[in-house]
């Protein structure tokens, strides 16, 4: 398959993957159905717990049954979960819908990246991965920005309309996946040997024993934890006394997040060429942490800091995926990427739990500053471990 064909199919997949219509309103639906903040907190924890627990099994299934089938299942299961939210009325029914939503996401997590990398590699153009994935992320983020703004308005007309529309869009996403070619992912190997769980465990161990890879994954997982706890408190911070935005402006703010992140994603390959991956991870995440550290002293910097955070994270995520892909054997690629995603989920749970306690004890802005300092210390150690090893491009790894 030629680069242009892979690229446009991936862009269409990214476009129909967006769930922007429900991003700014799904918590409002929970409140409208009479759920308490305790119930909402429980559902959020349940969602992340399912993400973490399902990552390895669904990643393994993705490698076992093929990436196209895994992505097809992801679209259908996610559509069912999102549609279920429209019908849910009780805590149990919301829990079941969110569980389906999370499981669907884990079927996609890592698998879409693994498919893209393999499809490009089969055509001898694996070096285009950063460019294509970055542009694909930009397409998705731009679509999310537009639909987020629409979703806020649509919600005022119909409580459930955004959920039904996203479920329909995900059905289109499933149809797009069916147009993907099947990419060889190592299934020509003996199934009696290659797909044993013991073999998978051995190959996962081998992947994470490569020089610097554990430290690098730890660095990016720690970064994700900081990003996730910040995202959790965006709405109470910007609507509260410290910033004072009207509630109606929050949808526009979320659209701004996605527009800026889309622009940054589109420039990922240029950042790689001009700045380099090593310098990016030395400067970008530390700039993010520094912007959070100053918030208790300069609350006016809150909105720019949150916008900048989204841009920095999306570029970092693409580079993370590229580095892990480069150093992972083809037939276990989705499984390894799912392990990385699982690590991010664990960090998200930990940061959110600690962040909630600290926010009640001090204040949300001071909590973010304290956790940003924790990140600076931890990332400094991990970056020292990875520097000079994992950031070296190894073409032999790419071809495996």
Regions found by a protein language model. Give the residues of each.
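C-terminal ends and interior cores of transmembrane alpha-helices
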Residues: 76-90, 95, 286-299
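Juxtamembrane intracellular "pre-TM" segments in multi-pass secondary transporters
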Residues: 1-3, 178-219, 240, 400
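Transmembrane alpha-helix termini and helix-breaking/packing motifs in multi-pass membrane transporters
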Residues: 32, 91, 144-166, 236-245, ...
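Helix-to-loop junctions at the C-terminal end of transmembrane segments
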Residues: 54-66, 155, 263-277, 359
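Multi-pass alpha-helical transporter architecture, strongest
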Residues: 171-180, 350, 367-400
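Cytoplasmic helix-loop-helix junction between adjacent transmembrane helices
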Residues: 98-142
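A single, central transmembrane helix in multi-pass transporters
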Residues: 22-23, 39, 159-164, 206-264
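Pair of pore-lining "gating" transmembrane helices in MFS-fold secondary transporters
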Residues: 1-35, 99, 209-230, 307-311
């Amino acid at each position: 398959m030629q680069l242009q064909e892979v690229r446009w199919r991936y862009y269409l997949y990214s476009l129909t993957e967006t769930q922007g219509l429900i991003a700014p309103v799904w918590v409002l639906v929970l409140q409208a159905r009479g759920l308490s903040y305790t119930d909402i907190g429980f559902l959020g924890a349940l969602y992340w717990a399912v993400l973490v627990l399902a990552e390895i099994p669904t990643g393994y299934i993705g490698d076992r049954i093929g990436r196209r089938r895994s992505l097809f299942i992801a679209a259908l299961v996610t559509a069912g979960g999102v549609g279920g939210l429209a019908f849910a009325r009780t805590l149990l029914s919301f829990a079941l819908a969110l569980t389906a939503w999370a499981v669907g996401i884990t079927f996609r997590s890592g698998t879409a990246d693994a498919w893209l990398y393999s499809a490009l590699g089969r055509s001898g153009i694996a070096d285009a991965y950063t460019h294509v994935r970055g542009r694909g992320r930009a397409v998705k983020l731009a679509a999310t920005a537009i639909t987020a703004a629409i979703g806020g308005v649509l919600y005022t007309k119909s409580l459930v309309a955004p959920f039904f529309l996203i479920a329909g869009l995900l059905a289109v996403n499933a149809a797009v996946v069916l147009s993907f070619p099947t990419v060889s992912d190592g299934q020509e190997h003996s199934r009696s040997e290659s797909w044993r769980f013991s073999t998978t465990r051995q190959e996962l161990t081998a992947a994470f024993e490569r020089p610097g890879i554990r430290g690098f994954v730890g660095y990016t997982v720690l970064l994700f934890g900081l990003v996730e706890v910040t995202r959790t408190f965006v709405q109470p911070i910007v609507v509260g006394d410290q910033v004072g935005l009207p509630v109606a402006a929050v949808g526009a703010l979320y659209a701004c997040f996605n527009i800026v992140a889309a622009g940054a994603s589109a420039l990922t390959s240029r950042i790689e060429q001009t700045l380099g991956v090593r310098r990016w991870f030395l400067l970008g995440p530390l700039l993010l942490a520094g912007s959070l550290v100053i918030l208790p002293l300069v609350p006016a910097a809150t909105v720019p800091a949150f916008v900048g955070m989204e841009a920095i994270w999306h570029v970092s995520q693409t580079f993370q995926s590229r580095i892990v892909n480069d150093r992972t054997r083809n037939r276990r690629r989705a499984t390894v990427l799912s392990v990385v995603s699982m690590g991010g989920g664990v960090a998200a749970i930990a940061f959110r739990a600690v962040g909630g306690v600290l926010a009640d004890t001090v204040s949300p802005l001071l909590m973010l500053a304290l956790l940003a300092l924790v990140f600076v210390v931890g990332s400094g150690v991990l970056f020292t471990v990875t520097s000079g090893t994992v950031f070296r491009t190894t073409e032999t790894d790419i071809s495996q």
